[in-house]
């Protein structure tokens, strides 16, 4: 029954959100209004993204203006990631994180092995909500905050907070992202927020984080998200500085699997980076954050123009304001591979304008300690011409991947 509730209620809330937001513009305040109980569960965080309500895709006015003055890793839009604070994880015993041999964080996972199917979202943005209402179970129409026990804060961001929660009826542990409607309205995020939910709620893959549904009240919107016990991969990379070949190849292979699934579904992620990769048990990754994602067939002649993502991961075609397609994810996979092995993105500079120039020229400097096979894969991924970039199938069958598989942990 719990599965059905989460499958259906998100679809109904999805298509009534924008109307509700417009009606209640004067009824918001900045307070989240959550009462925290003493429940110690640890899920993870998610984020939203930005776009104009009047147009599906609008260009960002200026790359320089959209970035902060520092060289911090921030998205180009008007939103900010909610980060999972890995240092605040309650350290229990039993299970261990194994990003590499140099780091072990003992934790015990309360997550259930089997998840629940997300909502099947219709492609058309408009639909008859009255007809849908007749098909929904009554419980899904009245989901409220009272249905959950609220635990500790897992992350904070410009748009809200992520809490650890337990569904009272089922006992299911999840993450609850809380965003104020007023902030969504002020930042003109309603439509992009809706598109993000439409995309992610319809994705079912072991390497992609699940969105189970969402509900709202007069002040806030609540996203119910999959629990990932070890948080963002970025935090593990910061602690270890860089991953060894066995660990990095395992992660790259899994991200390639996730991207292959997305591209088959005609979805471009457009924001691949360590912050958007979550770590579950047995070194299993979960690709998350679909705020910049769009539907766009790889075989289609339709190209995108929106500049989006994170500066260090932008491909040359975006830097030069050219059209782009699904191959931007291939480029980002190359940046990701380099950062895993070296500890920083390949074109990172203190001055962002210098970063722009290095990306445009593909001014790639390969450290001498990288293996020849890893170097070959990175060079094949980071081709300036999108047509020359290696395919995901070739990535997964590359010698660097194949030769390191024997060192990967067994996944249950």
Swiss-Prot record:
InterPro entries: Aur-like (IPR030616), Kinase-like_dom_sf (IPR011009), Prot_kinase_dom (IPR000719), Ser/Thr_kinase_AS (IPR008271). The active site is at 271 (proton acceptor). GO terms for cellular component: cytoplasm; kinetochore; nucleus; spindle. Pfam families: Pkinase. ATP binds at residues 154-162, 177. Coiled coil: none annotated. One of its GO terms (molecular function) is ATP binding. Residues 94-119 are annotated as: Disordered. Its EC number is 2.7.11.1. Component of the chromosomal passenger complex (CPC), a complex that acts as a key regulator of chromosome segregation and cytokinesis. Has a role in error-correction of aberrent kinetochore-microtubule attachments to ensure that sister kinetochores become bioriented and connect to opposite poles by promoting spindle assembly checkpoint signaling. Belongs to the protein kinase superfamily. Ser/Thr protein kinase family. Aurora subfamily. This is Aurora kinase. The lineage of its organism: Eukaryota, Fungi, Dikarya, Ascomycota, Saccharomycotina. The gene is IPL1.
